[in-house]
Amino acid sequence: MQNTELLLKELTLEEKCALLSGAETFKTRGMPQHGIPQIWLSDGPHGLRKQAGESDHLGLNPSVPATCFPTASAVANSWDAALGEEIGAALGEEAAAQEVSVVLGPGLNMKRNPLCGRSFEYFSEDPYLAGKLAAGYIRGIQSKGVAACPKHFAVKSQETRRMASDSIVDERTLREIYLTGFEIAVKEGHPRSIMSSYNLVNGTYANENKHLLMEILRGEWGFDGAVITDWGGSNDHALGVKNGSTLEMPAPGGDSVRELLAAVESGKISESDIDARLSELLPLVFDTKAALDAAPREFDAAAHHALARRAAEESLVLLKNEGSLLPLAAGSKVAVIGDFAKNPRYQGAGSSMVNSTQVDVLLDKLIDSELNVIGYQQGFDRHGKPDAALQKSACELATQADTVILCMGLDEIAESEGLDRSNLRLAQNQVDLLQAVAAVNPKIVVVLYSGSVVETPWLDNCQALLYAALGGQAGAGAVADALTGKVNPCGKLAETWPLAYADVPSAADFATRRKTVEYREELYIGYRYFTTAEKAVRFPFGYGMSYTTFAYSDLVADEQGVSLTVTNTGSVAGTEIVQLYIAKKNSELFRPAKELKGFARVTLAPGEKQRITIMLDDKAFRFWNVKANRWEIEGGEYELLVGASVEDIRLCEKISVHGTATVHPYEDRDLDCYYKGDVLHVSDADFEKLLGHPIPKGKTKIDRNLTLGELNHARSPLGWLVWLVLTILLDVSYKRGKPDLNILFQYNMPLRALAKMTNGAISMGMVDGIVMELQGFWILGLVRVIYEAIKNVVLNAQMEKRLRGA
């Protein structure tokens, strides 16, 4: 094992600077002459994506086969941190077998808005639940000697303009909603690394944000690992290093090294800043490399497939079961309809896409079951194209069956990295099919596949609804067993399903092309809004049915937690997820009506009862006092609410809590809309009162951070042409029903990323020449690009020679 302190004395300043950026898309720099190995990083929120051949960061090229587990959005419905730890251990085992040192996951961004195209990679709208699950994944991954890298830190809630948007959020909301999940993950999971997000937070890029990285992450939480940029996400590398960012990825080349050298020479940063970052990176490199050298190069694919199936079973959510249609009796004549039954949708698109070791198919599993499958019909085109013939054939089959199993869902394009959803609706051809089938056979079980929320105005057309989410490669077997009763669904929703998208508090201005993203709704996201505003929803947070029933009784509560008795009052075994919320009526603060502060899973046989305890932690009663700039507790009477969902509260006890607050955070501000939870249309004036300063107005500037999608603002025909070509290509891909992820990435990419993602082929000086050209200095800009290109080639060659020790 190398001694980092001694190594820092051996390395030249140039070598030190070189180690703080990647060498290839998923590889760090190695320096064999100093005994420093190169290590692999790989995407892996729900399955490893190591690309042995040509690499990319969008999942476009094939990867080594790996187990595809249910996505985070699915596993969150299990409310099972121990299951997350098992999945994490399997991910770590596969990473070690493939010689990957860092698994880039889990993702635990808050689900501010259900249109976020990457929601399938995230756990929940609730920070407590997300943090607990993420901590489980992290512990599991790192139990195999591999480093976990939770992401994206922080306040990233959309894909639109993701590399250049500025999240404007008040400090209380930042702390209580958008950082608490990460805090739990860091303090309870102890990750060796963490990924910074692309976006700015209150005017400063997250990757160089001193408040986030140094004051909170490293200072308050005690994180001593490596902060890794999202791919191409570095804006000012030197400032990032100074303010706590460790490793710039993927491969910016020698230009990045020269940037740090110049910053040290100018006094912008010091060599001690460089050493501090290497003291975070080098132990990770040496420790993980030693663990991988000792790890087997194979893993038990069958065992991991079985784990993926169990994870899918625990993640299924039964949303409707009218007349106890489910489970279906053995021998029932069933018609299987829907393209997803034969061509499964089991994962999302983008950098998390896994090359699965195998994929189960629901139709095959149903045929192998005790059901009498009388036939299958595709029913609809999965990409939304109307087809009367497919619908007619499906209806004819439905007339011959006792029950119809209709598989509906979102297609691969509806949910993807790089692209936010345009609405919450299912394709109309699927809804039309459901209505047509219901007219000839009302006994319909809908199996729904999606990574996030969908609107369900069609719910009355089916008798049962089983939410399969994106259940991974073994999800089909789990669904088949749930339909036949071999598995009793026990999942509960980790996010609210609204009646309509317009009810979502951030609906009015989500994913616009504006440079700023204003978090006007404050604390009121998800159930925190709906319960406070008393707004009806389709399915509340924490909701999920079972084939059995449970009774709650004998609640005892104090400041430490609650204990109660749970009894299975039904006729089959089942698992209940008991949820603990707190409420404070007549609070002097504005606060959500209810907030999740604990939960427990309990599995019971018919008639069995069990005493369970749910403990409260240091986050139960705290709030961030923006005036005192610290965590405090509002004293007084609280209600401890125990229930089966946020709306189904079974037991309640009142307790008195000693307060620590000495000053009211809002005594000099009129914030009625926040006290009422009326945040659908917060005025500029009210939001500015909350922020304590004017709302920043993002202006389009022709500089390094101009995105390619904004080149229409350039003063250059070349810029206009590039913008026009990109726009046309993007529109064509949309019309084909298959948006091009690479073009989408480029469209939202700032010019500076050209120097961060081309392995040194383009320098920042060349980017500055391009900027000059776009500003209207056509000839000077072109000359600058040519000059900087020649200079870059020469300097890179000289530097690489020195770094090789030649």
Labelled PLM ranges:
Residues 1-619, 623, 637-641, 646, ...:
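Glycoside hydrolase catalytic-domain context in secreted enzymes
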Residues 40, 71, 247, 357-360, ...:
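A broadly tuned "polar low-complexity/structure-edge" signature
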Residues 47, 368, 507, 572, ...:
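A generic signature of intrinsically disordered, low-complexity regions enriched in glycine/proline
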Residues 618-665:
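Terminal connector regions
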Residues 646, 653-723:
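Charged, amphipathic alpha-helical linkers/stalks
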Residues 721-806:
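Extended non-globular C-terminal regions
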